[in-house]
Amino acid sequence: MPIVNVKLLEGRSDEQLKNLVTEVTNAVEKTTGANKEAIQIVIEEMKASHYGVAGVRKSDQ
């Protein structure tokens, strides 16, 4: 049972997140041969203030 965790900055629409789940599921099915019914996608949205690169938070850019 593949479980895919996706972390991204908040701000996407519900439609975008729905499409993300569909497309990731299709990609996992195609590349691993797993049944769609067994594939789980977990989306975690982060605030820009909770994510940083090179010592700088995204909210400070």
Swiss-Prot record:
EC number: 5.3.2.-
Cross-referenced Pfam families: Tautomerase (PF01361)
Cysteine pairings via disulfide bonds: none
UniProt keyword list: Isomerase
GO molecular function, one term: isomerase activity
InterPro entries in alphabetical order: 4-OT, 4-OT-like_dom, Tautomerase/MIF_sf
Record: active site: 2 (proton acceptor)
Superkingdom in the source lineage: Bacteria
Sequence similarity: Belongs to the 4-oxalocrotonate tautomerase family.
Matching PANTHER family: 2-HYDROXYMUCONATE TAUTOMERASE, TAUTOMERASE-RELATED
Protein name: Probable tautomerase SSP1389
Species in which this protein is naturally found: Staphylococcus saprophyticus subsp. saprophyticus (strain ATCC 15305 / DSM 20229 / NCIMB 8711 / NCTC 7292 / S-41)
Higher taxonomy: Bacteria, Bacillati, Bacillota, Bacilli, Bacillales
